[in-house]
Amino acid sequence: MVPSDPNLSTMPRSFAGEADWIALSDARFFGSGVTLSAADTKQPQTGLVHTGLFVMELALPLAGAMVLLNHQYDQGWPRTFAVFHDLAAGLVILHRQGKSVVRHVLPGPIPQGRGTGRLSFRFDAPARIWEMSFEVLGSDPPASVSSSGRNPFPFHLADVKEICSAQRANGPVLWFGLTRGAAPPARAPWIGQRTPVETSLGPVPAGNLVPGTIIMTADHGPLPLLARHNLTLPARGSFAPILLRAPFFGLRQDLLVSADQLVAVTGAEAEYLFAEESVLMRAGDMVDGRTALTDQRRAVIESVALDLGRPALIEADGCLIATGHHAGAEASLRCLHSYEVLTLMALLGRTARRSA
């Protein structure tokens, strides 16, 4: 059956963990095979990122003038990377290397509102061009502004490491990161590493599954696991995961999943509204503050996406979860639109029923 909502496909175009992340805030983590030697730290010009994308997500609305990020290195060859906001001036990135200073400006006022805003700064030092944009995520109509200019500096890996490892004070910055990709990773379905997945040997934590493990599915019987994709992602802002509370979903334990993860719900209410015994709902659409919660307690999440070679429904502590990563395949259940989820949740008294 083709999903009702094409945006709710269980097959993401690419895995969210494959976005060439170099570093993420609040994490002593480097991806994409980037390593730093002692020489790189002492002589940062030996480790450079010439092209890439700096991304920062912010909790809106922003107050008046404030410093969003401020990295200062004053020993030897001085360097600065700072991000400022001002209601009138807009957003400013100040980048200093030695005696040279550049300012990249996104003139204000920037779009405000409530929710999450994303600042994107794309730089190409060899081509001597940069682009900066700010958007209010999920706004209707879309709210965004952009600017561009010339002569950006490359990023020094030693600075990136320090910026992303430093402790930050509480403020509007939800997370930030540097990637070699042209855009941040698309959000995609995933499950937490501790999710108990039903196998031929009983429940096994998702993070411990290995290729060849026989996964017990509700719609296609036993299937061998082809691959387990380990993902390291931001866990705040637009990437914040959803905590599905027991016993409303899992029988005995809470389940941590992506906001885009599809969860099966079965009951007379689903059949009454949609003439389907079971339907799939996006976890993010089920947030009600009681049975399903947005969880932003951690900065970075280690999660997994399972590849069974086809879309399938796996069981996690009594809750059926959709998985599948092959383009062109079809989910076995109808996927509800966001407004349909609201209707069903209201009929359920906003108490989600797990799939039996």
Would you name each region that the model predicts?
Residues 16-67, 119:
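A carbohydrate-recognition surface predominantly in extracellular/luminal proteins
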Residues 44, 52-56, 63-64, 96-98, ...:
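Sequence-level preference for short, compositionally simple segments enriched
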Residues 69-95, 146-152:
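Glycan-recognition/cleft segments
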Residues 96-118:
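Short, aromatic/His-centered strand-loop micro-motif at the edge of beta-sheets
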Residues 115-123, 132-134:
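Short tryptophan-centered beta-strand motifs in secreted/extracellular beta-sheet-rich domains
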Residues 143-168:
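Flexible glycan-contacting loops in extracellular carbohydrate-active proteins
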Residues 192-199, 218, 222, 226-328:
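Long beta-strand-rich cores associated with HINT superfamily self-processing modules
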Residues 207-214:
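Structural motif
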